[in-house]
């Protein structure tokens, strides 16, 4: 039997998150990897939930075959794993409280308290902001809760994640500010030694984009109501 073991950190809606009703991991990434696996000839997909910073070590040790988790392709990560072609273009965005008029964009965050999710591109970016106090959380939801409770001036995270948060009710107390910083691409990670798998997934991804299946999955999660 051909089984694909997939590692993900399900705290990044709408890419991967745990369904409150039945505890199943769901999301755009999950639908995509299932479709890719099927195209590539796998009979079974097993999803393992792993802490974000444990994903690359799990690939290296062979505990999982691939990781799909809204992971940005960066040079530092490329030294440890192989990435597929990008499957999603993201970018960074900030959200603040609805009544905050002082922060108009990412440039106004100097010296402010910023909530971020551990290990993300947003967390890295926050560290570069002059005089900012960065508070780190295990999930993007918890970072947003800190904003709601008044413990942070802003949350920096990936554009689609924060858009989804606003759409799911966050807009009652929060708003996005400024222009998103684009040019961040998500890829599926495989172990360095597993080059064949990477090639297989790239081929499957190209096919999904060509036959309209990718667009269907995309629309399911990202099409505005």
PLM segments and residue spans:
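Periplasmic-binding protein-like
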Residues: 10, 89-96, 159, 163-205, ...
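Extracytoplasmic small-molecule ligand-binding "clamshell" domains
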Residues: 2-70
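Beta->alpha turn/N-cap motifs
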Residues: 8-12, 48-53, 62-74, 97, ...
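Acidic, polar ligand-binding/catalytic clefts
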Residues: 46-108, 174, 178-180
């Amino acid at each position: 039997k051909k089984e694909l073991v997939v590692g993900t950190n399900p705290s990044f809606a709408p890419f991967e998150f745990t369904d409150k009703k039945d505890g199943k991991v769901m999301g755009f990434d999950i639908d995509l990897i299932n479709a890719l696996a099927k195209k590539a000839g796998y009979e079974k997909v097993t999803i393992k939930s792993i802490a974000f910073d444990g994903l690359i070590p799990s690939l290296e040790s062979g505990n999982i075959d691939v990781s799909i988790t809204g992971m940005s392709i960066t040079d530092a990560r490329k030294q440890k794993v192989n990435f597929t072609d990008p499957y999603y273009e993201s970018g960074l965005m900030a959200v603040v409280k609805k009544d905050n008029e002082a922060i108009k964009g990412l440039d106004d965050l100097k010296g402010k308290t910023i909530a971020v999710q551990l290990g993300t591109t947003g967390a890295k970016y926050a560290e570069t902001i002059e005089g900012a106090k960065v508070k780190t959380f295990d999930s993007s939801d918890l970072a947003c809760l800190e904003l709601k409770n008044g413990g942070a001036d802003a949350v920096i995270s990936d554009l689609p994640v924060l858009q989804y948060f606003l759409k799911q009710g966050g807009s009652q107390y929060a708003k996005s500010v400024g222009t998103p910083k684009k040019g961040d691409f998500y890829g599926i990670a495989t172990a360095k030694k597993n080059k064949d798998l990477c090639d297989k997934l790239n081929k499957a991804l190209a096919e999904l984009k060509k036959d309209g299946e990718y667009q269907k999955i995309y629309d399911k999660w990202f099409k505005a109501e």
